[in-house]
Amino acid sequence: MSGTAQAGTVLTVAAAPGVTPRLLRLPAAVETHSAYLADGGYALLDNVETLLAEVDRSGLLGRGGAAFPLGVKLRTVRAAHLRGHETVVVANGEEGEPASVKDRWLLRHRPHLVLDGVRLAARLVGAQRAYVYVSDRAAALAVDHALDEVGFDTLGGLDISIVTVDPGYVAGEETAAVRVINGGPAKPADKPPRPFQHGVAGHPTLVSNVETLANLPHVAAHGAAEFRSAGTEASPGTFLVTVTGAGRPPALYEVPHGVPFTDLLALHGVSPDQVRGALMGGYFAGLLDRAVLDTTLDHETFRAIGSGLGCGAVAILTDDCPVAVAASVLAYFDRENAGQCGSCFNGTAAMAAAAGALRDGAATAEDVARLDRWSVVLRGRGACATLDGAANVAASLLKRFPQLVEQHLAGRCETCRDGTFSAQRPYEVEASRS
């Protein structure tokens, strides 16, 4: 089994039944400037404080993985502006997570929605400069064309630049984005300081995910109460979920937070009886067994079971062996780490080697014990969260699939006997759509 990497496969794009899309635009042609204006885009902002209050009440959480409240970020950078500091906005569209496609899709198909979100964020924090940070060539071209269409005056005098970078897992980390814009390497920096303290050119900087910013125009146009009409109390609004695996073409869905996981399966055409588990949050949040069938898609539910929604990427495991999937993901972390923190460089290599040996039936009980120990002691020891992601994958494999681990120790995994899952970039998906 060569794996289920799905690069180049046609992407299904749809909203959940009964959901009026806020982020997706169907059919999925590239939205023009005139079409966006006709829908009320680039509306004048009368009162900054009023919109800030609405963002606070909306409870809009970051869609990049950490689910940090956008209102808190905005107010922190705005406070620096009010103290007389120059401020900057960065729209982070470097979607380094191979199993996620949402940000690239928005940048390619709805660049004006993203730019409108950047415009509003800049007004809220008092910024005159902003950057759209991307690694996808098609996304960069779409944004560049949109900037030519929209004009300087519509943006309120905001100077927006596009910064491109080679794709990479760590390149999307917020301090890596700032380093690239400042002329440095696409590698995370030690924290503190964080970008809101000392970012682009040393100025307080709001770094926010593309999908997060794309929600701002909806809040501005319709208010917090309407935004909260979808989702849960703690996880309000809709969000974009990239679904891969299960032997089916990849898909990008817009769903409300709180929807049952089984509803997502039905939308994707997968029977719960087929499901062995899921790889959650792209590669970061680790593996879940069939307990995932009892979940709802919101941050509070997944935190309670030791997992996470992360960037909203869900890989459904049906025929793939979770041990082999974990080994592939850990090998990816080993290749993709920045190579600048010894604990991460050595830790990801050690975990990848142990998981690879387990997949191949060559591991010992001592290897598994070491993998278990590393998944605990290595957390929080890198400049970014790459090592934490690797630890999550290792820990969740051992916790959720102990019987499979034992089968691999005994060299008798029936799934791997038919061919080992060995994708270099497991569940990778492109933003293409026919």
Q: Which positions does each model-derived feature cover?
A:
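Hydrophobic alpha-helical positions that pack around
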Residues: A139-H257, H268-P272
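Short alpha-helix boundary/capping segments
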Residues: K102-L113, P204, S208, Y253-P256, ...
